[in-house]
Amino acid sequence: MFIESFKVESPNVKYTENEIHSVYDYQTTELVHENKNGAFQWTVKPKTVKYEFKTDTHVPKLGVMLVGWGGNNGSTLTAGVIANREGISWATKEKVQQANYFGSLTQASSIRVGSFNGEEIYAPFKSLLPMVNPEEIVFGGWDISDMNLADAMARAKVLDIDLQKQMRPFMEHMVPLPGIFDPDFIAANQGSRANHVIKGTKKQQLEQVIKDIREFKEKNKVDKVVVLWTANTERYSNVVVGLNDTTENLMSSLDKDEAEISPSTLYAIACVLENVPFINGSPQNTFVPGLIELAIKRNCLIGGDDFKSGQTKMKSVLVDFLVGAGIKPTSIVSYNHLGNNDGMNLSAPQTFRSKEISKSNVVDDMVGSNGILYEPGEHPDHVVVIKYVPCVGDSKRAMDEYTSEIFMGGKNTIVMHNTCEDSLLAAPIILDLVLLAELTTRIQFMSENEGKFHSFHPVATLLSYLSKAPLVPPGTPVVNALSKQRAMLENVLRACVGLAPENNMILEYK
């Protein structure tokens, strides 16, 4: 059974006019390596820690500024949200299609809330806590191309023509602000699009971005702004002592107009200085150490890296399944070809390297979790190839071969072909990222040993489910297994309304 909404009734939960307050018993374990009777052994000790959560239930008017607004992802997301808001339908060769949010965790997935008369009861994910309605978002942003959003949508060739015709009147007046362009960080083939750029030194560019954010917020009368990078993949920035390793050095390098500060890092610095959440949707190392330090000092949310939408999402499920089943993956070979502008930019070796790193690290935690299958330091062979094939456009092809060792030296091979509609998969992920980032800023919590409430760590691990290479606080383990990432996000939000984590034991039926 599916229900649209619910309210928790419990002595541990209190709803007021402005907030939801919950008391939550967090059950975990601690391990001790101790000497007992002359021999060291591991002892696991269950423990319970009491937490309190409070969530501000005032849903703000939200502005979303996309870096690369006129790209495939930005134009597709903007058109999709408007189409949903206006209730637009359009004819395809198969049927009359209604606008929807399929592919969005917050808008199109469900959670289990319990059982009733022997039947499982589910509710929308978005019913857990008050979230921004996507159709009330005000969109804006920057682009190095001056093309309006209607023409950008046509250039992208993602949406059906009948839908594009209906969307044009809503989008032709939407024009991105000039963007920061540095040809040293992206492929040379992107130069032909760069007719709409912010001039000046890096510090002047930073100041212009800050000015743009302030003016957007004032003009549109929004309460909050979230900025997300959905522009070209950049090459990796060199992390150098004295350049960007500390906040002080990073800001000094900015004053000196150092060449190694990337455009994405400039946008992120601007957001942190304005206390505006910034999310990196591409694989480059935007968050250099000095920037992470700045975000932590100013308690400003940052998240990333790289949208997890197609091939990598499948990989994080399949490898988790294989290792969890006691099967040993020994080789993972991933081949991609795509024909959109992302593919053209990735045809340059330096930008491809950023994507290769992002895609290659996705299985590390799963391999490291099983010391029966893998010796220390042992790892499957893992190769990632990406090629630019203009003919396929936004319909990225992903082909994977997984070779595994099974019982008694046997071999198992799984071959998968995945046609990933690149922007149609990424757009709802962008939506989820900005909605969850905004929600995160309204939640505070404390443990029984702390004296006051505080926000989550500025490095937003709650967004890991949506990120190919999750950004985590220094010293924090990286989790890539998709089921664990989703469970973490859902269970934290459940705790905010006093619900136990979903453990799937269902003892009442055993």
Swiss-Prot record:
Gene3D superfamilies, sorted: NAD(P)-binding Rossmann-like Domain
What tissues harbor this protein?
Answer: Expressed in siliques, leaves, roots, seed endosperm, but not in embryos. Highest expression in roots. Confined to vascular tissue and hydathodes of leaves.
Name the Enzyme Commission number(s) assigned to this protein: 5.5.1.4
Out of the domains of life, which is the source? Eukaryota
Subcellular localization, per the record?
Answer: Cytoplasm
Effect of inactivating the gene:
Lethal when homozygous.
Look up the record and report any one GO term of the cellular component aspect: cytoplasm
Tell me which InterPro entries the record gives.
Myo-inos-1-P_Synthase, Myo-inos-1-P_Synthase_GAPDH, NAD(P)-bd_dom_sf
Keyword Flavoprotein assigned to the entry: answer is: no
Under catalytic activity, the entry for this protein gives:
D-glucose 6-phosphate = 1D-myo-inositol 3-phosphate
- Quote the pathway field: Polyol metabolism; myo-inositol biosynthesis; myo-inositol from D-glucose 6-phosphate: step 1/2
Query: Which cofactor is essential here?
Result: NAD(+)
Q: Which GO terms describe its molecular function?
A: inositol-3-phosphate synthase activity
User: Which BP terms does GO give this entry?
Assistant: embryo development ending in seed dormancy; inositol biosynthetic process; phospholipid biosynthetic process
Q: What class of enzyme is it?
A: isomerase
Note whether Lipid metabolism occurs among the keywords: yes
Keyword line: Cytoplasm, Inositol biosynthesis, Isomerase, Lipid biosynthesis, Lipid metabolism, NAD, Phospholipid biosynthesis, Phospholipid metabolism
According to its UniProt entry, what is the function of this protein? Key enzyme in myo-inositol biosynthesis pathway that catalyzes the conversion of glucose 6-phosphate to 1-myo-inositol 1-phosphate in a NAD-dependent manner.
In the record, the note on similarity to other proteins reads: Belongs to the myo-inositol 1-phosphate synthase family.
The UniProt entry, under PANTHER family, shows: MYO-INOSITOL-1 PHOSPHATE SYNTHASE (PTHR11510)
Q: What is this protein called?
A: Probable inositol 3-phosphate synthase isozyme 3
What's the gene?
IPS3
